[in-house]
């Protein structure tokens, strides 16, 4: 069983190159890496071609980019990964092993925020507990799913924000997620730049607004203007 690693990118620069360097061992084992460009103007992007199996171009938007990557994937399992992630060497093995021994069709990893502030430790713990309790995953937790199942549900909804929450709700009707305690480290840059408490409150409010029916387009406008 093989995995297609799909990475949507938009001006991710140095973080992207660091990620790609770190996962080359997976290519050697027959897994593929697909980079989906949403309109980069970062010159460092052009140096990454030899580190991936496919480079695709599409309009910006994570949902659009990830769906395009899935459409060109060859392997049985799709693994959607953010460009600012840092991964354990055993991540791919863990995905394959847990899907094979269970009846689950999808899953996600626990998350660790990269910064050292003590509040980030509390936030990441709350995020992991919430995800395990609700069966809802966020994109920075590295969502993985059988390609056949992804195709059956028509992939990510083409919405501007909350595409990860939306697809989780549909996937958990089929099965609960595999919740791997192996951690993906994700950048805490946005938390530190915008303020940890401010960012936490914003994320909670956006999620609440999504659940009560505020449109993803409106939420995207609020998120990016903040």
Residue ranges and their predicted role:
Residues 169-226:
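Hydrophobic helical membrane-anchoring modules
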């Amino acid at each position: 069983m093989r995995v297609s690693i799909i990475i949507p990118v938009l001006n991710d620069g140095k973080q992207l190159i660091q990620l790609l360097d770190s996962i080359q061992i997976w290519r050697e084992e027959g897994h593929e890496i697909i980079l989906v460009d949403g309109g980069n103007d970062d010159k460092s992007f052009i140096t990454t071609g030899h580190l991936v199996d496919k480079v695709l171009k599409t309009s910006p938007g994570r949902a659009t980019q990830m769906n395009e990557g899935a459409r060109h994937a060859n392997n049985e399992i799709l693994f959607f990964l953010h460009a600012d992630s840092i991964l354990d060497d055993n991540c791919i093995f863990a995905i394959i092993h847990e899907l094979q021994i269970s009846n689950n069709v999808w899953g996600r990893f626990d998350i660790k925020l990269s910064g050292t502030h003590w509040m980030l430790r509390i936030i990441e713990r709350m995020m992991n507990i919430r995800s395990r309790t609700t069966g809802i995953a966020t994109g920075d937790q590295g969502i993985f799913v059988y390609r056949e199942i992804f195709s059956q549900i028509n992939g990510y909804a083409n919405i501007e924000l909350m595409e990860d929450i939306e697809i989780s709700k549909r996937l958990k009707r089929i099965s609960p997620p595999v919740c791997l305690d192996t951690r993906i480290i994700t950048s805490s840059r946005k938390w530190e730049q915008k303020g940890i408490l401010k960012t936490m409150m914003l994320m909670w409010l956006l999620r609440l607004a999504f659940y009560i029916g505020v449109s993803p387009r409106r939420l995207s406008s609020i998120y990016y203007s903040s």
